[in-house]
């Protein structure tokens, strides 16, 4: 995170060397599931919330038949960023880059938001590090809705969140040292 700040400055500051953009212009938030040419018996990766660490890594995943998990779960693909949207997982830093998914496809907890990098605009490593920054999570926590222990960060909040977007070349340099 300190390397991130050193390279890009505070991405949440109103004083930016990078152009301010809505996060929804930097990535696709909760992309639609495409028509998939998989059979119900084909395997995909299943990633429940406990399989995502508070350190930004996937710690466990299992293969499941697509037919058993194609409904009722959050869909994602390799290089998508998973962001825990519910208390206390969001505040604790749960999030990771989906990678090494069986058939390139994963499904998991409905309590994930999916941030899909846009080719030529954003890197999964930049998105993950941004969303794991304490200041990002503190602001997100202040904008949660719901009651008691069931508060969530909305997709609308993420979509409209303003951030300084560095050039993709800078993001790739960061990715190389990540």
What are these regions (language model features)?
Residues 24-36, 47-81:
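Sequence-specific dsDNA recognition surfaces
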Residues 98-100, 143-147:
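Short amphipathic beta-strand starts and helix->beta connectors
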Residues 72-74, 78-132:
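A short beta-sheet element
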Residues 16-19, 36-44, 142-144:
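Short coil/turn segments at secondary-structure boundaries
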Residues 25, 126, 139, 160, ...:
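Short, solvent-exposed alpha-helical surface patches in well-structured domains
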Residues 1-36, 168-176:
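Non-catalytic DNA-recognition/assembly elements of restriction-modification systems
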Residues 105-113, 145-172:
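A short glycine-rich beta-alpha junction/loop motif
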């Amino acid at each position: 995170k300190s390397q991130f700040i050193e390279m890009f400055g505070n991405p949440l500051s109103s004083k930016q060397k990078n152009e301010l953009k809505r996060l929804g212009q930097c990535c696709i938030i909760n992309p639609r599931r495409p028509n998939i040419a998989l059979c119900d018996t084909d395997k995909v990766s299943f990633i429940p919330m406990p399989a995502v660490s508070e350190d930004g890594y996937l710690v466990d995943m299992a293969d499941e038949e697509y037919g058993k998990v194609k409904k009722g779960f959050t869909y994602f693909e390799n290089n998508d960023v998973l962001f825990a949207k519910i208390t206390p997982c969001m505040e604790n830093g749960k999030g990771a880059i989906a990678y090494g998914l069986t058939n390139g496809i994963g499904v998991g907890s409905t309590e994930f938001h999916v941030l899909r990098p846009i080719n030529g605009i954003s890197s999964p490593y930049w998105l993950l590090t941004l969303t794991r920054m304490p200041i990002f999570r503190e602001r997100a926590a202040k904008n949660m809705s719901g009651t008691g222990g069931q508060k969530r960060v909305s997709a609308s909040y993420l979509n409209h969140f303003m951030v300084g977007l560095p050039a993709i070349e800078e993001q790739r340099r960061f990715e190389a040292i990540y």
